[in-house]
Amino acid sequence: MQKKLDESNRPRFHFTPEKNWMNDPNGLVFHKGEYHLFYQHNPLGNKWGHMSWGHAVSTDLLNWEHLDVAITEGADGAIFSGSAVSNGDEITAIYTRHTEANQSQCIATSKDNGRTFTKYEGNPVLDLAMADFRDPKVFRYADYWIMAVVKPHQHVCSFYRSTDLIKWEFLSEFGPTAAVGGVWECPDLFPLSYKGEEFWVLLISINPGAINNGTGTQYFIGDFDGVSFTPKYSTTDPRWLDFGRDNYAGVTFNNEPNGRRIFIGWMSNWQGAVLHPETSWTNAMTIPRILGLTKMGDEIVITQQPICEPTYEIVIDATKKHPSGLTGFVELGYNPVSKKIFINDYETDVEPINQQVHLKVIIDRTSVELYTDDGTRWITMAVFSEPKVTRELTNFG
């Protein structure tokens, strides 16, 4: 008799696979009226393996329709992370083909809005004969395509260009710099504006070696001229997209119709994903976040605002002598001594405004996302406990 698995921990409005294992978001693209979310997926079980691309679509980024596996592992190798572009009437996926000895970049094309894909017969389209060379992010720039792809152990992001997605010309490299305590993965490069001035943002995920001693995503603000990325500020100290432990491998949507830069991350980490409770599904994505820029002191920094309303809004008196916030199945709030916001043991600096700290919280059964009102500080944490434990929080302090 098949064991019935408890579904009470499944998030209500964060994306989860219909069943089996999921990790990195892949191929985020808007095409013909639908947001496409592809993702690293094991169609055969709840643990990592048999990597293929799962697939779901949405019109609002909150309600998702599960579709069949888009690109499956084959005799020639597993289907690792990558991206997708809207290319006329077609969707072209650009992904890493993985074998024990080699990682190379390949493409597959869909003529039916992502429902089926055909692998290019001439694959791979980019092969350096390296064991670790992966995670291509491709986007349109001027009249050609740009690819950002990493050499993980060298802590280098390489840039290539192409006019047809098949023949690729090497342009430049960025790195090593900033956080290099683990492998570099899942790059993304995109423009954002602040008060009419355009900047370019480069995202690099790292595992391990992030601020929380696990996985995380660092970002760089700078300029991209179609050939090379030049950081605007010193890269000695890394800048972190999230100060929690559970936001990794995040990338943004190509071809977003409203001009927004929308980010989704894997709401887990490689240290804790194996501890996921026994359910029919494994792992979730962060809430989609709209990225922007603001100025803190003399520097431009990233802001993130969720596409949904928060569960809680908290205004904390920063003049109190003791920490205050919300407590229950987790404890979160603000510590006036250290001037940090926190979820359990994860924290980050926050400067009060008019002696107040404005916090917002998104709770969805097994996850907590805490962020400042201006969106400059986020802490994301997956939390698993007994299903009957309340998800309510009460004030303390």
Where are these regions (language model features)?
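Beta-rich accessory regions
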Residues: 1, 195, 221-397
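Surface loop/turn signatures of beta-propeller and other carbohydrate-active proteins
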Residues: 1-26, 45-48, 62-86, 114-140, ...
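Structural WD40 beta-propeller signal
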Residues: 31, 87, 139-141, 190-192, ...
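Entry beta-strands of beta-propeller and related beta-repeat scaffolds
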Residues: 34-37, 89-94, 144-147, 196-202, ...
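Beta-propeller blade signature
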Residues: 52-60, 105-113, 159-165, 215-227, ...
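Accessory beta-strand-rich segments of carbohydrate-active enzymes
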Residues: 73-77, 100, 116, 146, ...
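Carboxylate/His-rich catalytic cores and anion/metal-binding grooves
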Residues: 81, 90-124
